[in-house]
Regions:
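Small-residue-biased structural context
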Residues: 1-148
């Protein structure tokens, strides 16, 4: 699996979790789903920031996009921390979760459809993307083993 396919799969998994969270009225269940979302996003951000973005920054025409994505990561991480610290019955929990959903979906859409991924497909060889995919998979598995 190449790097872009792996990152797309991560985006889809989180999107499914968002739908699951939005589909339940049970606040404790919603908090449980949020913790799963938090874990998925932490792993995803870590592999993007340590493996994917550094590889993409080698291409001059991608540097601004990478910087923008890193800024979005900072905002998303701050929001994750805020939500994590809220009790599930807090009146702010649902509204902050909704903002998180919107921010992450915007970030994924920007990467996949509008800007980054299409440009990467033009710039990088399939061999480079496959190699990067393997590196991302290794980093992801390492992160998940640490979390267990």
């Amino acid at each position: 699996m190449d790097a872009l396919e792996l990152l797309h799969e991560d985006h889809e998994k989180v999107k499914e979790l968002f739908e699951e969270a939005e589909g339940t009225e049970n606040q404790k269940e919603k908090k449980r789903i949020f913790e799963e979302i938090n874990s998925e996003l932490e792993t995803h951000a870590r592999i993007e920031e340590t493996v994917f973005y550094p590889a993409m920054q080698k291409h001059q025409e991608l540097k601004d996009m990478v910087r923008e994505s890193l800024e979005e990561h900072k905002q998303i991480k701050a929001l994750l921390k805020q939500i994590h610290n809220l009790k599930s019955d807090s009146e702010k929990f649902d509204s902050k979760l909704q903002v998180l959903i919107e921010d992450v979906e915007h970030h994924a859409e920007e990467e996949e459809e509008r800007k980054m991924f299409p440009k990467i497909r033009k710039i990088c060889s399939q061999e480079e993307l496959d190699k990067l995919g393997t590196e991302l998979e290794t980093a992801k598995n390492k992160k998940q083993r640490k979390a267990s």
